[in-house]
Design a protein with these regions (language model features):
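Replace the tail clause
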Residues: 1-337
Length: 339
């Protein structure tokens, strides 16, 4: 953990964010000059891949060593300066400073407090929620609800089983890394319960309940406790269990397919095609806002009944696929968090 803390500080200083897996490239005398979190094997339009990045960094070290030395010196100076700074002794001032710095990172368009990849970051949301309630700060409360709405109605949530995927690969919370972890479910259940208690909006009660139902049905371990996670991969590749094509939706729903596609943003071209290895025609369920509101706006008489029917038919269709493997380790810390 101590080593990780050092290099995480380097990554945050160089990129403005951190996360895992963590990659930091060092000079022979252990001075950092490049940092990143997840690096895919192959490059995409938005992200360099490891097979291209390694030769590039090798060429920079070989041909532009002065530039490398300058970058590493700047980073080391910034880290050392940060270490030398005095500590705030006033707890109230420390809390206000933390709130100011976090809200300065807020994504006004899509919610969240970091660039992509976007994690749920529930401890940040819980801190800001308590701050907003104590100080009656409506603007911060709006930041939290916008973030939670985007998470809930984006591709990061499994709209059929109710669980949340590990993180979103893009700023709009559209394409997730499809792994589901018990610790994330526990934290998401907590934040959606607490925001429901504060706002009294029933959508948050429903969302908290759906996460808990996923935990108690899919992750529940027979002897007691909860399994650790569901894998991102299934026999068809990463995320294949969760992806849909336009033709599949037409086959399942017939004349109702247009309504379903509109509600979930499904297109013939695919709403995630080309993103991080997704194929043409690949779609995630991506309503962007509460599906009940979408159905009401479309003139559906009984939105709740219609939505339940749509989810049921999609769930039955997905049961024909092979589910991703379950990691059935029962971890004490994650179970304590869940319970």
């Amino acid at each position: 953990p101590d080593i990780d803390q050092v290099y995480m500080a380097v990554c945050q200083a160089m990129t403005g964010s951190g996360g895992w897996p963590l990659h930091v490239f060092l000079t022979p005398d252990k001075r950092p000059f490049y940092a990143a979190t997840f690096i895919p094997k192959m490059s995409s339009p938005n992200m360099p891949g490891m097979l291209d990045l390694l030769p590039y960094l090798a060429s920079v070290w070989r041909d532009e060593r002065e530039k490398v030395s300058y970058v590493s010196d700047q980073i080391m100076s910034a880290i050392q300066e940060q270490t030398r700074r005095g500590t705030l002794h006033d707890p109230d001032e420390l809390i206000h400073t933390a709130a100011r710095r976090l809200t300065a990172l807020y994504d006004k368009k899509y919610g969240g407090f970091s660039p992509a990849p976007k994690f749920p970051s529930v401890p940040v949301l819980l801190f800001l929620l308590r701050y907003a309630v104590i100080h009656q700060d409506r603007s911060i409360l709006d930041m939290i609800t916008t973030t939670l709405n985007r998470m809930a109605w984006g591709g990061m949530r499994d709209h059929l089983d109710g669980g949340f995927h590990r993180y979103a690969t893009d700023t709009a919370w559209k394409l997730p890394h499809f792994e589901k972890m018990l610790s994330d479910q526990a934290m998401c259940a907590i934040i959606y319960t607490e925001i429901w208690q504060v706002t009294k909006q029933d959508r948050y009660r429903r969302l908290a309940r759906s996460v808990l139902e996923y935990m108690t049905t899919v992750l529940s371990d027979a002897p007691g406790g909860f399994s650790s996670s569901e894998d991102a991969d299934s026999p068809g590749g990463e995320g294949a269990y969760y992806l849909w094509s336009y033709d599949e939706i037409e086959k399942i729903f017939g004349e109702e397919a247009r309504l379903v596609c509109t509600m979930f943003g499904i297109t013939r071209e695919g709403n995630v095609s080309g993103m991080h290895g997704m194929k043409p025609g690949d779609n995630v369920l991506f309503p962007e806002r509460d599906p009940l509101e979408i159905l009401s706006a479309a003139g559906v008489r009984d939105p709740e009944k219609t939505y339940a029917s749509i989810l049921n038919r999609l769930t039955n269709a997905r049961k024909e696929r092979e589910r991703p493997p379950l990691d059935d380790k029962v971890l004490t810390d994650w179970n304590a968090l869940a319970i």
